[in-house]
Amino acid sequence: MTVSENSVLETEVLVGGSAMPNERPGAMEPQSLTEMPEGFPRRSTVANGVRSRSSRRFFVVGGALLLSSFAIYEMGAVFSIGGITPLEYLVLLLFAINFCWIALAFCSGIAGFLILLRKPKAKDLEVTELHTRTAILMPTYNESPDRVFSAVSVMAEALSQTGHGHAFDWFILSDTTDPEIALLEEQAFLVLRQETHKHSRVYYRRRRKNVARKAGNVADFCRRWGSRYDHLLVLDADSLMESSTITGLAQRMQADPDAGLIQTIPSLINGTTLMARLQQFAARIYGPVIGTGLGWWVQKEGNFWGHNAIIRTEAFMGAAGLPNLKGKPPFGGHILSHDFVEAALIRRAGWSVVIAYDLPGSYEECPPSIVDLAVRDRRWCQGNLQHSRILPTKGLHWVSRLHLLTGIMAYLSSPFWLLLILTGLMLALQAHFIRPEYFTDQFSLFPTWPIMDSDRALRLFYITMGVLFGPKIFGVLLLLKDGQFARSVGGRIKAIFSVLFEVVLSALIAPIMMFIHCGAVMSILMGRDSGWSPQRRDDGSMPWLTLIYRHRWHMLAGVMLGYAAILDSLTLLAWMSPALIGLWFAVPISAWTGSVKIGEVFKRAGILATPEERSPAAICLQAQDARAAYQAHISKPWTLAQLLKDPALMELHLAMVDKQPLRAAGTPIEPVEAIVHVKVHEAQCQESAMALFNRQEMALVLANPLMLRSLQKLPEQFVAEDLVSFC
C-alpha cells in the first residue's frame, strides 16, 4: 500500500487510534547487588526446568583448563632451562592470561564443530495457537527513520500473514534528541499507520528525556505498559526478523514456563563497505561454530546480547531492574552494558536463559568502518569494564559470572597482548645488548647461561596458533564439507580464496584494533565517559586528514616497535612484521576498508560473499524496497514553523507526543527547561523565539504541549506597528 504525502498531511486524526495504548503501570524495582532478594530463586514449574548438564561444562571449561595448564607448563619449561628471570616470569604470567582466554573459545569451537557436523535442525514445536501476548520493541536513538519504520512495516505485514498477528503489538520507542529526526519519525509513523492499521497494532513513543539510555528506554516502557504483555521481543534499530522466527520464539516461550529469556544468534546483513563485508563473512563462516558451542555448553545459563531476543515480562520486571552504581561514570552511574547484567539477574531469580543457536531468520547489521567500530567499542568497553562492579553480586550463577568476565576480557585482552609483545621484545633486546652474568656471586664450577629451549618454544608457538585459529579452521572445514553451503558463497575455490583474504586482512586490522582497545581502556581508567553517539550504518568513508588524526598514535606505535625490533635483528623485525604492517599502513587500511566503492568491487568479484548476500531472505528484500519508499514519503521534513502555522498538523503532532505528565508546579525544573520557558516568555513572535532555540531546546519544545500552545499564541512575525502601539 502506498501513501502520498498529501493524504498524510490531510489526515486530521491519527489513523489507527492513539499513538500508544492505555497505560497499565507495573513495578520494576532496582535489584540489590549485595543481598539476595527474598523469594529468589523461584521454584521451577517443570522438574529440572532450569537445570543444566554438568558434563557439558566439564568438556568445555575443563578442556580449556587442561589445555591452558599444558601450555603454561610448556612455556615455563621453555624458560626453566637456564633459570627463570623476573622478566620471564612476567612473560609467563601474561601468556597464561592470554592463553586461557583463547583456550575457552577453542573448546567452545570444538563443541560447536561436532554439533554442526551432524547438521542439526531447529527443534520442531507443535504449532499451537498463541494465547500469550508479546510486545515487539524497536528502540531507536537518532537513527534514520526510513530504516527503522520500513523494517517494522515489512515485519508487521509478514507476521500478519501467519495467522498469529493478533498475539503481537509493535512499539517504536524513540530516545531521539535531534528535533529534525524527531519530526521525521512522526512523518514516518503516519505512513506506517496508514500501511498497517488494518492488520497490525503499531505504536510510537518518544521520551522527553532519555534517562539511562536504551536500558532506561525499555524500563520506561515496562513500568508504564509492560503489564499488558506476557513477553517482550526486543529488537535493535538495525534488526530484522522473519515471521517464522518471531512466532517460533513466542511458541518456545509459551511452551516453557521456566524460560526467562531466549536469545537468537543474528546473521549480519546489508554490508556495503569492505569492513562490513569482512565482518559479515567472518560471522557467517566462523560465528556459528562459536555460537553453537556456546549455546550447547551454557544451556540454561545463557546470555543476552541486547536485542533479537524474547524475554518473559514477569522475569524481566521482577528480577532485572538495574540499580545505579555508586560513584560517577565511567565506573559508576547507569549500567551501560545492561544486557549481560539483565541475563545474570534473570538467571539468579530462577529463570532459564537460553541461546537458541538452532533458530535461523534473525538479522542485524554491523559498523561500516574501523572508526565506527572503534566508536561502538569505546562504549561497549566502558560498559564491560563496569561489570567488574557486578562480578561480586550475591547469588549469581558461576556461568553468569563467567559471561561477565568474558565480556571484560574482550577488551582487557588487548592490553595483555600488547604487554606480552612488549615484554617479549624486551627479552630480545636484553639478550642482544646486556652482557650476561656467566658466573654469579655463588660459587659454581659451571657458568649460568641465558638459555631457552628453542625447539619447545617453536612447538608451543604452533600450538598457540592452532588454538587461536582453531574456530576459523572448524568453520572452513564445515564449509568445504557442505556442498550446498559452499555453493551459496560462490563455490569452494572462491570460498577458500575469501577465507585467505579474510585471514590476511583481519591480521592487518587486528593490531589497529588492539591499540584502539588499549586506548579505550586507558581513557576509562583515567575517568573519561564515553557519551552516547548515534551510529553510522551505511557509508564508512571519512576524509584522509580525519583518518590521519584518528590513527596518528597507531602509526607512531608501529614505527617505534619496528625500530626496537630492528635494533635486535632483521629476523625479529620479520617475525613482528605481520603486526607492524597493519600499524604502518593504518590510514590507508582504514580508508579502503570503509569505502563503499571498494566494497562494491569485492562484491562484484564474489569475494567475502555470504548466503544472505547472494540469496537474500524475502524479508530483507522487502525491507530494502520499503526503505526506498519511505525515503520518498518523508523527503520533505516538517518544521516547527509548519506546526505552528497549520493547526491540523499541530494536532497530529500533539497526538504523537508522549502523554507522560509534565512537571508539576513547585517541583524542581531542569536548567534547559527553565531556559526555554524564559525564551518563550520573552519572545515577541514565533520567528524570534525559534531563532533563539538550539537543537536541544527545540527537541524539548516539540515534546512539551504547553510550550507549543504558548508559541501558538504568539504572532508569526514581529511588525513595526506592534512596537509603535507598545510605545
Curated annotation (Swiss-Prot):
Domain of life: Bacteria
GO biological process: glucan biosynthetic process
Pathway membership: Glycan metabolism; osmoregulated periplasmic glucan (OPG) biosynthesis
Keyword Membrane: yes
Location in or out of the cell: Cell inner membrane
CDD domains named in the record: Glucan_BSP_MdoH (cd04191)
One MF annotation (Gene Ontology) recorded for this entry: hexosyltransferase activity
Pfam families: Glyco_trans_2_3 (PF13632)
Top-level EC class as recorded in UniProt: transferase
Cited InterPro entries: Glucans_biosynth_gluTrFase_H (IPR023725), Glyco_trans_2-like (IPR001173), Glycosyltr_2/OpgH_subfam (IPR050321), Nucleotide-diphossugar_trans (IPR029044)
Keyword set, alphabetical order: Cell inner membrane, Cell membrane, Glycosyltransferase, Membrane, Transferase, Transmembrane, Transmembrane helix
Main location group: membrane
Membrane topology field: Multi-pass membrane protein
Spans traversing the lipid bilayer: 58-78, 90-110, 278-298, 408-428, 460-480, 496-516, 572-592
One GO cellular component term: plasma membrane
Sequence segments annotated as region (Disordered): 18-45
Known EC number: 2.4.1.-
HAMAP family, per database record: MdoH_OpgH
PANTHER family to which the protein is assigned, alphabetical: CELLULOSE SYNTHASE CATALYTIC SUBUNIT A [UDP-FORMING], GLUCANS BIOSYNTHESIS GLUCOSYLTRANSFERASE H
Protein name in UniProt: Glucans biosynthesis glucosyltransferase H
Organism per entry: Shewanella sp. (strain W3-18-1)
